């Protein structure tokens, strides 16, 4: 088992890290050559990095407090979702500052089967891996697909912190993460920069259950959407039960009752696949276009 990592807070709490976090946080934010209002106000008031120095002092003295947020109801992928928005300064910059430091530590401990919140590993790469798996026609006669009910809103914040504490031993950092994860009354929220990677890393436990303990050969996960291929239907039923038990007992979440277990009827396109179109029918990531 890898050793826990220390001295994380000291890497986060530097002026240089906050400056770089600001630069990363504003990437691709210009509309018609103009930054949004929050960034413009920050730039106007951040003379000689005075605001970043103030944030640095708050972090160092542990006096930082979570700021108000807004919630916008929006329909995406045929579902209504609550999108949470925080102020650019200090919250969004701080989220980037934290992720800049912990990202390599978390991603290095993930398995190759995970495809969310990781640079260079999105839906296209997940579909490519599925296509590669499907070349073994005898070993991929059946597929199991399932996901978690209301994934982000039902994440247990204390469980998320507990899992992070198995990677990091820096108490000051863990106290900061405790505050950031508990920004809202419950769940990890869509729109918070720290949410996706944190949630994705949590489910590394599921990845290791499926591939190491149960020995599944063909498996792909995009956040909470999981696809397992096999030539044994009974094995997939066992996998479903084990996943369900782990998700309920450890994460205190629930697998959708309408999971799919079916014989494969046709493959993904051999040479190309189109990017999912907004508003299209079917599963969110089109990883299961496998059954008739």
Regions found by a protein language model. Name each.
Residues 128-223, 227-250, 262-263, 284:
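Conserved polymerase palm-domain catalytic core
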Residues 1-9, 95, 99-156:
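Active-site-proximal segment of RNA-dependent polymerases
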Residues 55-79, 169-183:
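Reverse-transcriptase-like RNA-dependent polymerase core
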Residues 253-292:
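A conserved non-catalytic segment of reverse transcriptases
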Residues 79-111, 185-213:
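Conserved pre-motif C helix in the palm subdomain of viral-like polymerases
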Residues 1-53:
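Non-catalytic, polymerase-adjacent accessory regions of viral genome-replication enzymes
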Residues 40, 69-79, 111-124, 150, ...:
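Short, glycine/charge-rich beta-strand/loop segments that flank catalytic centers
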């Amino acid at each position: 088992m890898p050793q826990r990592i220390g001295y994380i807070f000291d890497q986060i709490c530097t002026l240089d890290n906050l400056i770089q976090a600001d630069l990363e946080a504003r990437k691709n934010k210009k509309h018609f050559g103009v930054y949004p209002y929050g960034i413009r106000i920050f730039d106007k008031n951040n003379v000689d990095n005075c605001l970043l120095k103030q944030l640095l002092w708050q972090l160092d003295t542990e006096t930082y407090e979570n700021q108000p947020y807004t919630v916008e109801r929006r329909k995406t992928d045929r579902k209504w979702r609550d999108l949470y928005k925080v102020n650019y300064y200090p919250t969004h910059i701080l989220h980037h500052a934290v992720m800049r430091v912990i990202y390599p530590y978390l991603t290095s401990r993930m398995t190759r089967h995970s495809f969310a919140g990781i640079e260079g590993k999105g839906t296209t790469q997940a579909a490519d891996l599925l296509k590669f798996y499907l070349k073994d026609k005898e070993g991929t006669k059946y597929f199991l697909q399932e996901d978690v009910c209301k994934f982000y809103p039902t994440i247990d914040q204390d469980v998320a912190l507990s899992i992070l504490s198995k990677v990091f031993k820096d108490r000051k950092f863990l106290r900061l993460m405790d505050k950031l994860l508990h920004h809202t009354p419950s769940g990890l929220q869509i729109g918070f920069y720290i949410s996706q990677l944190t949630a994705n890393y949590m489910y590394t436990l599921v990845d290791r259950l499926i591939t190491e303990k149960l020995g599944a050969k063909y498996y792909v996960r995009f956040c909470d959407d999981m696809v397992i291929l096999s030539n044994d239907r009974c094995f997939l039923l066992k996998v479903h039960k084990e996943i369900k038990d782990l998700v309920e007992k450890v994460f205190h979440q629930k697998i959708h009752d309408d999971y799919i277990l079916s014989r494969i009827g046709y493959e993904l396109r051999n040479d190309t696949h189109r990017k999912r179109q907004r508003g299209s029918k079917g599963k969110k990531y089109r990883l299961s276009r496998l059954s008739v």
